[in-house]
């Protein structure tokens, strides 16, 4: 498959400490394709909005009036994307944009409609952090696989890449407003029988002191989302 343009969708919520660094890395990431960078501010209350305004003259910047959640921000960004491939990029420096070229390979070769960047199937370095997070991720991924019939190793990864056609198919079905979007994306990928590949990626996880936002309540909510989006939502 030929990829002339890559859309990079970046949801932002209170990331003033890392935002400039992430955007610099995204802009410098080595891609032969044209980049379309789409940033969605999800009602930030720090200086993130002011920082994003500095980039508004050269990239797409969307400002939500209030905090609506990652799912809402991503859905808005997906709707604006015009690239042949669409990459999700968090604004927290946990994931390295230099790896875009690796993530795109299965699509370029015509083997995949969707690519997940896995933090567990990798020869790249990754920061060792909380066992509780690892256990929660593995448990949620196992439960998701049980419902979807897929064999994904890292459902909660930020790095998910979609062909334009794949996103066109699943976007009308997406409803999640917050972190449930990770579960819903995987459920819709399975419902639409899209071809999924995994690529190993590096990972530099944050501590709560660094600004990590997800917590045990999100884990419990994810269990409900797995049941909801797999049993009670149509594809």
Spans of model-derived segments:
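Hydrophobic helical membrane-anchoring modules
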Residues: 1-6, 17, 147-150, 173-235
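Donor nucleotide-sugar binding loop of glycosyltransferases
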Residues: 15-18, 44, 70, 96
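Short, well-formed alpha-helical segments that are part of the catalytic scaffolds
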Residues: 15-29
């Amino acid at each position: 498959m030929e990829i002339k343009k890559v859309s990079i969708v970046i949801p932002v919520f209170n990331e003033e400490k890392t935002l400039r660094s992430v955007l610099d890395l995204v802009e410098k990431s080595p891609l032969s394709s044209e980049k379309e960078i789409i940033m969605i501010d999800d009602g930030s209350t720090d200086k993130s909005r002011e920082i994003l305004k500095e980039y508004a003259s050269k990239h797409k910047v969307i400002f939500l009036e209030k905090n609506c959640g990652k799912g809402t921000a991503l859905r808005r960004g997906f709707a604006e994307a015009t690239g042949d491939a669409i990459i999700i990029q968090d604004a927290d420096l946990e994931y390295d944009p230099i790896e875009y070229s690796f993530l795109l390979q299965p699509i370029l070769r015509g083997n995949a409609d969707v690519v997940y960047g896995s933090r567990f199937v990798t020869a790249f370095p990754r920061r060792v952090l909380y066992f509780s997070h690892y256990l929660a991720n593995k448990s949620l991924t196992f439960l998701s696989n049980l419902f979807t019939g897929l064999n994904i190793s890292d459902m909660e990864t930020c790095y998910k890449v979609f062909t334009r056609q794949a996103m066109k198919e699943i976007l009308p079905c997406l409803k999640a407003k917050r972190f449930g979007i990770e579960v819903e994306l995987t459920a819709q990928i399975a419902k639409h029988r899209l071809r999924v590949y995994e690529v190993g990626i590096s990972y530099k996880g944050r501590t709560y002191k660094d600004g990590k936002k997800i917590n045990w309540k999100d884990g419990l909510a994810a269990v409900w989302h797995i049941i909801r989006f797999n049993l009670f939502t149509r594809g």
